[in-house]
Amino acid sequence: MNPCQIFASLVMSICCHILSSTAWSVNNFLMTGPKAYLAYTSSVQAGAQSGIEECKHQFAWDRWNCPESALQLSTHKGLRSATRETAFVHAISAAGVMYTLTKNCSMGDFENCGCDDSKIGKMGGRGWVWGGCSDNVNFGDRIAKLFVDALENGHDSRAAVNLHNNEAGRLAVKATLKRTCKCHGLSGSCSIQTCWMQLADFRDIGSYLKIKHDQARKLEMDKIRMRAGNSADNRGAIADTFSAVARTELIFMEDSPDYCVKNLSMGLHGTEGRECLQSGKNLSQWERRSCRRLCHECGLKVEERRIETVSSCNCKFHWCCTVKCETCTQTVTRYFCAKRHRNRRPHNHSRKRQHTRRG
Amino acid sequence: MRKPADEHHFTMETSGMHLVGFWLHVLLLFQLSGLGDSASKDIVCEPITVPMCKGIGYNHTYMPNQFNHDNQDEVGLEVHQFWPLVRIHCSPDLLFFLCSMYTPICLQDYKKPLPPCRSVCERAKRGCSPLMIQYGFEWPERMSCEQLPMLGDTDRLCMDRNSSETTTLSPPFPKPTPKGTPRHRATAKSAPPQKCDRECHCRGPLVPIKKEAHPLHNRVNTGSLPNCALPCHQPYFSQDERTFTTFWIGLWSVLCFVSTFTTVATFLIDMERFKYPERPIIFLAACYLFVSLGYIVRLLAGHERVACEGTGDQQHILYDTTGPALCTLVFLLIYFFGMASSIWWVVLSFTWFLAAGMKWGNEAIAGYSQYFHLAAWLVPSVKSIAVLALSSVDGDPVAGICYVGNQSLEGLRGFVLAPLVVYLFTGSLFLLAGFVSLFRIRSVIKQGGTKTDKLEKLMIRIGLFTVLYTVPATIVVACLVYEQHYRPSWERALACSCPSERQRLGMGPDYAVFMLKYFMCLVVGITSGVWIWSGKTLESWRRFIARYVPCRTRKPPVSASSMYSEASTALTARAGTAPTGTYHKSAPSSHV
């Protein structure tokens, strides 16, 4: 469903572009518009998809776990929410699109763009110079802005918030760029190095934005001026409010609902039936407390289920050169949130439970 | 509301010419979507095309590798630089190690990294690193073995032929050809670069004392290792440095001998000429004569015969010994007379202080000469006897002499460093006091007229000589301080590290410091010769020769010479009534 939704959005975006043109002829559009724009469509689509997957990973152990409904950026049903989580979705989607466009540009997938050679040959530091293929983030930023911001055609504060969060996502890609070097020298020595700027792992960008999500700020619009609607006064109020927020920070306008409870009208499924983590090595503190956060604090209990899994184990390298692994069947214990059953039919049982509660 | 309007508008617009364009876009979108799907960015296995790495056991690799090489052409350019090393067969594992790093193995059914094991890297490094060091290269840091997984690590798999359960022949290296040569090389190099383990043990060039019957058993340790002796020669210095040491010591000791011999001979033929306070210079020169003789004995007998014991691989430096005659002889000559020369320098500064500062006459100072001799000869005697009694004589692995403190820090500090510091300090005090007094009474001397010019010049000459002595003495003390401070770490490094590491970290003694020490030990003897450089020396020798030949017939001239000598000693150039007057004047000063 996700690709179809985004695909539909993209198609509508392109059609709107066509409709908005007044002096376009069919020949001109086919010669320039389609080639220039259709070349990026698959990258935009793949980038948005990677953003969705990263969102699911970053919020895997949160009450709000990036459900499908949150990914319908423009829907005809109901009102679009402007919560903290929505801000993250906008940012990670924009980052994903920009990331994929930039990477495909460096890979030579597009004819009209290539490496960022603005620093080629310049002295970077002691013992290293700029060279190689620096990722062209400016190109990715420009095209991503063109595509993603086109989905916002309103002028109200909600649209302004979304555009701001889109930009924050793109800035996250720039903020996580890292310098990578290659050694040159006789017999493997590193007497001189050539360095270039390279995109970080997309996971790093997701983690970066997750921190921004936790630090997001709520906008307090002047309610009186908001009544003006889509008037000049409203736009002035929006401009005044946004000038005080850094471009790298996420912002939202509405408080988040209770994600413990199922609310199908808002596309929320609640935490019942969700899996959580109890124990295990290499678990972070956030993961270790996921059962408390998802189950206990939502009024549910933790239910154990034993599941058999088949995996490769005892891999060994055999000279030369193969790796042979055994197939192992393991019983692993997984934990899920379940409702607490309260049966009041037997009178005696009811009394007994009350007694337990008192104690 | 807006969107329904848009939809309506869209429906109206699509009718007509735009309809064809719309479907064309959709068609292109689907096509591009398909293209996008096919362009996946996962690891792609590709056949190995680097000629050097074909046939190493696997055929597929992936790019970029860990060195950020984008394609195999780039890999080939860099890895081919190692071809000479591979060709020379310094290690049978080098080729596989290099290729597994530069063209990493790519398996379709195993996606985790599969680097070579640490053992493969260490075998290649052990075989080839010494050869690389000979040509000025170090083992590349980015191929360090510590970052590779260990064989048998379950979390990180790695490649090594030893992990194979079934014994299979390695295709790149057939058994007979490489095993012979590498083994021979390994055998040849087994001792020096014993794979650079950091465990402390009595390794070469240290000499282990294994037999209990050995006289040094349980009596000697190096770097806190028991039953471990230092070799005959300083292990930190190369053969060229050792040869130069012999030349260096020989040069200065011969020069010292010639200079001091001349001085002593001149004194013996004309003893009246050198009176106090300058007479200690003669005795100081005599001491240096015997010190240089000690070094010359070492040169004639050789390093091994004087300072070492044992034969072949078991030859080691002498420890705590009193037995060998050559060793004891060299020790006595250098130590006894060296210390005596220091005390004579103190006596010189003291007598100079009496003459220049306290205005004593030479007769008054000479009256105490027996005490000066007692101190100058008795104190070194007591110390030398103590060293011999304590069996503290040991060999010097650098100079090849026998001395005290070469293998014992307590001996070095107690018998060498402490006395030298005391002598240097005491003599400097006398010099300082003398100069202060000299400046104070300068005006009084000048009031005496031209008669005081010679006296003042003599005082300044003696003072200058005495002050200049402090320079080499201070340098010797500094060298000894440096040596006693760092020697434990030098010995520990011999036991706990390997030669290449020691050479790289520079954890050995400074060769120049030792050469400076031996030069400064002998330079005073050389410079003491300048004392006799004057016309008087020629006159003394001429008179000596004339007096020797016609002994009988010239008794009156002898008397005349003695009279003239007295006049000369009185520092006056006039004859006749002047000598009598001068003598008369000096009597009151000596009385005072």
UniProtKB/Swiss-Prot annotation, chain A:
Tissue specificity statement from the Swiss-Prot or TrEMBL entry: Expressed in the margin of the pregastrula embryo destined to be the future mesoderm.
UniProt PTM: Palmitoleoylation is required for efficient binding to frizzled receptors. Depalmitoleoylation leads to Wnt signaling pathway inhibition.
Compartments where found: Secreted, Extracellular space, Extracellular matrix; Secreted
Disulfide cysteine pairs (residue numbers): 55-66, 105-113, 115-133, 181-195, 183-190, 260-298, 276-291, 295-337, 313-328, 315-325, 320-321
CDD domains, sorted: Wnt_Wnt8a
GO CC annotation, single: apoptotic body
Record GO biological process: anterior/posterior pattern specification; brain segmentation; canonical Wnt signaling pathway; cell fate commitment; cell migration involved in gastrulation; cell proliferation involved in pronephros development; central nervous system development; determination of dorsal identity
Lipidation (O-palmitoleoyl serine): 187
Segment forming the signal sequence: 1-25
One family name in Pfam for this protein: wnt
MF (Gene Ontology): cytokine activity; frizzled binding
Glycosylation sites: 104, 263, 282, 348
Keywords: Developmental protein, Disulfide bond, Extracellular matrix, Glycoprotein, Lipoprotein, Secreted, Signal, Wnt signaling pathway
InterPro entries found in the cross-reference section: Protein_Wnt-8A/8C, Wnt, Wnt8, Wnt_C, Wnt_CS, Znf_C2H2_type
Listed PANTHER family: PROTEIN WNT-8A (PTHR12027:SF92), WNT RELATED (PTHR12027)
Family under the similarity heading: Belongs to the Wnt family.
Function: Ligand for members of the frizzled family of seven transmembrane receptors. Required for mesoderm and neural ectoderm patterning during gastrulation. Involved in axis formation during embryonic development, via activation of canonical Wnt/CTNNB1 signaling. May be involved in the specification of the spatial patterns of expression of Gsc and other regulatory genes leading to the establishment of the embryonic axis.
Full protein name: Protein Wnt-8a
Gene source species: Danio rerio
From Swiss-Prot, chain B:
Protein name according to UniProt: Frizzled-5
Coiled coil region boundaries: none
UniProt GO BP: camera-type eye development; canonical Wnt signaling pathway; cell differentiation; eye development; liver development; negative regulation of canonical Wnt signaling pathway; non-canonical Wnt signaling pathway; swim bladder development
Occurrences of domain FZ (ranges): 40-161
Family under the similarity heading: Belongs to the G-protein coupled receptor Fz/Smo family.
Region Disordered: start-end pairs: 162-192
Signal peptide limits: 1-38
